[in-house]
Regions:
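Blade-loop segments of beta-propeller domains
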Residues: 1-42, 61
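Structural signature of eukaryotic scaffold interfaces centered on beta-propeller domains
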Residues: 14-30, 71-87, 129-143, 181-191, ...
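Blade-level signature of beta-propeller repeat domains, shared across WD40, Kelch, NHL, RCC1
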Residues: 234-274
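A short beta-strand motif characteristic of beta-propeller blades
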Residues: 2-11, 53-68, 117-127, 166-174, ...
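Conserved blade-ending motifs and adjacent loop-strand segments that build the rim/top face
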Residues: 8-11, 168-183, 215-243
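Loop/turn-rich, solvent-exposed surfaces of beta-rich toroidal or solenoidal domains
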Residues: 175-221
Length: 274
């Protein structure tokens, strides 16, 4: 791919993670958005797609009122669109409480002036205190949010606030060499697919069933480990949408620490599963 320099956003103070969502209603129109965490300014930045124009009135402060060391230093971000069309941001930070409430959830909406506002909804999520939490991923269709508690495992919660804050699962607790990092979700049908989790230090991904087991939807046994060429990957994404002749069943993109992105067809990943 080629960088579109006219759409590059510069001058942010340590942008950390990014996610996209479709159809946020602004000024009576549906707008696709890209949202990134700006760590050192303790705020979200929101841009319309595909033009990458800021629509956040200069930035939206996060974790207001928190005073602990690095408790406002933003890291992970994942967006969730519920069945009614409401869009939420799940936001993580460099450090946080070990007593619950590590992730804060905000509803994104029109402020009435053509810009986006964020309304605090809830805080949830266990943190081991061992390392940090960066990678967050949401399964819109099934209504779950997952995040990597580095060095511990992947934690699973309901994405919908009304369903409560209880932890549904802690999986991927064995076989990782160092940090648990990027989480990607591949759909094979409306309710089935795979969860891919980066084992950063080993340059590989552990793969788990999206739908859980036959007896328990919150039981995610490991299916396979797949090696990749990317080094120290802490970011990835996957789509099941057919893109072209090379990526007929989707594309898995993996970030490498040499500032490159590695592209894999889903067929390259799938051959290791069966």
């Amino acid at each position: 791919g080629k960088i579109q320099s006219e759409k590059v956003v510069r001058g942010l103070k340590r942008p950390n993670n990014v996610d996209i969502e479709y159809g946020l209603k602004i000024g009576g129109k549906k707008v696709d958005i890209a949202v990134t965490t700006e760590r050192m300014n303790h705020q979200l930045r929101i841009y319309s797609l595909p033009d990458m124009k800021p629509i956040d009135n200069g930035g939206i402060p996060m974790f207001e009122g928190e005073t602990g060391t690095e408790f406002r230093d933003l890291m992970g971000i994942a967006l969730y669109k519920n069945p009614k069309g409401k869009i939420y941001a799940m936001v993580g930070r460099k450090n946080g409480p070990t007593t619950g409430g590590y992730i804060w959830q905000y509803e994104l909406s029109d402020n009435g002036k053509g810009q986006v506002k964020a309304t605090f909804i809830r805080k949830f999520g266990t943190y081991s205190g061992k390392k940090e939490i960066e990678s967050i991923a949401v399964d819109d269709a099934l209504g779950y949010v997952y995040y990597s508690d580095e060095g511990v495992g992947v934690r699973k919660y309901y994405a919908e606030p009304s369903k409560g804050d209880q932890e549904l699962a802690l999986f991927a607790t064995r076989g990782f060499s160092e940090d648990h990092e990027g989480i990607s979700i591949y759909h094979t049908s409306a309710r089935k697919g795979y969860i891919l989790v980066s084992d950063q230090g080993a340059n590989q991904f552990h793969i788990f069933p999206r739908e859980g087991s036959a007896k328990n939807p919150h039981e995610h046994p490991e299916l396979k480990v797949v090696k990749v060429e990317a080094k120290q990957s802490d970011g990835s994404d996957v789509t099941a949408v057919p893109l072209n002749k090379t990526f007929k069943k989707g594309l898995f993109v993996v970030m490498s620490d040499d500032k490159t992105f590695h592209y894999y067809s889903w067929e390259q990943i799938k051959k290791h599963l069966f």
